A protein has these predicted regions:
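Conserved Class I SAM-dependent methyltransferase catalytic core
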Residues: 39-43, 95-154, 161-167
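Amphipathic alpha-helical repeat scaffolds
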Residues: 76-81, 119
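Flexible, glycine-/basic-rich loop-and-beta segments that form/coincide
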Residues: 155-246
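Local beta-strand N-terminus motif with an aromatic residue
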Residues: 10, 71-72, 142, 163
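Conserved SAM/SAH-binding loop
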Residues: 60-66
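A short acidic, Gly/Pro-enriched loop at the edge of an enzyme's catalytic core
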Residues: 66-76
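Class I S-adenosyl-L-methionine
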Residues: 1-52, 56
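Short glycine-enriched, charge-decorated loop/helix-capping segments at active-site entrances
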Residues: 89-94
């Protein structure tokens, strides 16, 4: 919906780490004429995706084996999370963990003016080190971000984690820039969270609070607001995602 509001209708769409292609299945009608490209490491899941989307160009291999520079108009998906690195010669020097690597590689594969809409762990935005956010900001403009409550993926992943949807538009070339969202601020409870969400609390779709970790510490979390449907909240939030799709 957010990408449609920007003016995107059809083009080359990439879903890296696609699983069985949940995002492909949710494409709005006006985008159905797009050419779909997917990448999935797991052979069984990848074969299921090929059966579900026979017209899509699906690669059953690691994302590191693909290399379509400046090719895609739109990239969507759920970024894999982990503390390990992917062995990709072109990116090894960055030292990024897998979810950060997916952002870096996708930024190279999307064309200038193209859009990335990724679901990622809140630590992309909230981790102490600004290094990865600075890398992204130099190569793409943050059009907006939506922070989801911790139960948003309970049915899918069986875990209560806070996730973000990030909307990025690739720049024509990397520039030296350090916008506010590269850095952290503090919320009213004193937790360090991304400056974007400090400045735009309306983009947090739940109540900010804390929870006890397995180590007995208090950690930031977002709990759903009783009586509100997440689908309705998302519909309202995407209106704040500012961007114009460039053909």
């Amino acid at each position: 919906e957010a990408v449609g509001n920007m003016g995107f209708q059809t083009g080359n769409i990439l879903e890296p780490s696609m699983g069985v292609g949940n995002f492909f299945g949710l494409l709005p009608e006006q985008m159905q004429g797009s050419k779909l490209y997917g990448v999935e490491l797991d052979s069984i899941t990848g074969r299921i995706a090929k059966q579900l989307y026979p017209k899509a160009d699906i690669t059953i291999a690691g994302f590191e084996t693909t290399d379509r520079k400046d090719f895609y108009d739109l990239a969507v998906g759920n970024v894999p999370f982990g503390q390990y690195q992917v062995d990709d010669r072109a990116y090894n020097k960055l030292g990024f963990s897998i979810h950060d690597y997916f952002f870096a590689k996708t930024l190279d594969q999307v064309r200038p003016g193209g859009v990335i809409a990724f679901v990622t762990s809140r630590y992309t935005m909230d981790k102490q080190s600004p290094e990865v956010r600075r890398y992204i900001a130099q190569r793409a403009e943050l059009l907006g971000a939506i922070r989801l409550p911790n139960n948003a993926f309970r049915a899918n992943a069986g875990t209560d984690v806070v996730s973000d949807i990030l909307f990025l538009q690739k720049r024509d070339r990397p520039i030296e820039i350090e916008p506010d969202w590269v850095h952290l601020g503090q919320n009213e409870d004193g937790f360090a969270i991304n400056r974007y969400f400090v400045d735009h609390p309306e983009m947090i779709l739940g109540r900010q609070t804390s929870e006890s970790t397995q180590y007995g510490k208090q950690d930031f979390t977002v709990v759903p607001i009783e009586g509100l449907k997440l689908a309705d909240q998302l519909h309202d939030a995407v209106k704040y995602i500012r961007g114009t799709y460039q053909v």
